[in-house]
Amino acid sequence: MSCTFHLPCACPLAPAILLAPKISRARPSFPCRSSMENQQLIRGSKLMGFPYLTGPHRDTMVDLISAMENRLGCHHLLPSSVPPDVEHYQNESGTSQGTLHIRCGIDSSPIDFVLASWLHLELPTGGALDITNIAGYLKSSTDVPHFQFELVKCSPTFLILFLDLIPRKDIVFSPDYLKTYYEDTQLEKFRQRLDQLPEVQAYFSSSLYFRRVVSPTGIVVSIKCEDGAGPERVEEIIREHVRPISNDIMRIWIDMCVGDGVEVGETERAVLEKRDSLIKSKAIEMDLSSSMPKQFGQEVADRVLRVIKSVYNV
């Protein structure tokens, strides 16, 4: 079985977006819930069920979502206002299912929004794709990179991992940016750790644009264990390597978000906004516009994608 992806991105899937009516981006001022209340709500949602994942894959997702909830939670994030029919959705036959959880940042927070999702797509040829995604986007008031985690199970013995802090500046023109967010944080050691495993190989996206967006320390790899231990070895790699590495990179990113950060002037802010908008628009165009209606039908696709476009503000 082969998997071909153009751009794993900060969208909840590797499908598509249509021209849909734009929703107001005004963010409702819900009363802030305690961290425990927020955890109870998200744990009771379809998102945290992960019915199709192996234990190590599920534990990795729970770790990352819990880290966001615990450390950002009430001080930075509004409660999710995703409608119930978008929080969990499926096609008519139930062969394609998905969840979507989004929390936008409060006005005073550098967080624009955080997003978590999973997709289960049964294939006509047999088997299924299971796509899990967690993303954190920042406002233009800071130049902190965006966070992106995506783990795709193409088969019990074949995974694709995309884990990166996505740069928001051209690193060639901004060597200080490279030093602050990538060299001083020693992100390269995580990529090198995975690279030492014989089952892990670099994954080259068919999209040249995507390759340009990824940072120098970005992890874009395939994990293939078709010889010997097979599925058991895949689970071991997730448990012993992918999970701790993902947790460490999430911790580094959250530390950046809640730290003092870099004061961004008006001119630089406009440049950041333009770059962020272009990346979001391209991600929607490449990953969402064509395949989601095929997988879920037009009505479901329009409903889900309308919410995504609203949050992306594109």
Regions found by a protein language model. Give the residues of each.
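Alpha-helical oligomerization segments
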Residues: 251, 255, 259-314
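Short Lys/Arg-enriched alpha/beta "domain-start" segment
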Residues: 35-140
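Short glycine-rich, low-complexity/disordered patches
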Residues: 77-89, 203, 258-272
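Intrinsically disordered, low-complexity proline-rich segments enriched in Ser/Thr
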Residues: 9, 13, 80, 117, ...
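Intrinsic-disorder-associated interaction segments
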Residues: 54-57, 61, 183, 231, ...
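Extended, non-transmembrane interaction/recognition domains
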Residues: 128-261, 265-266
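N-terminal chloroplast transit peptides
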Residues: 1-40
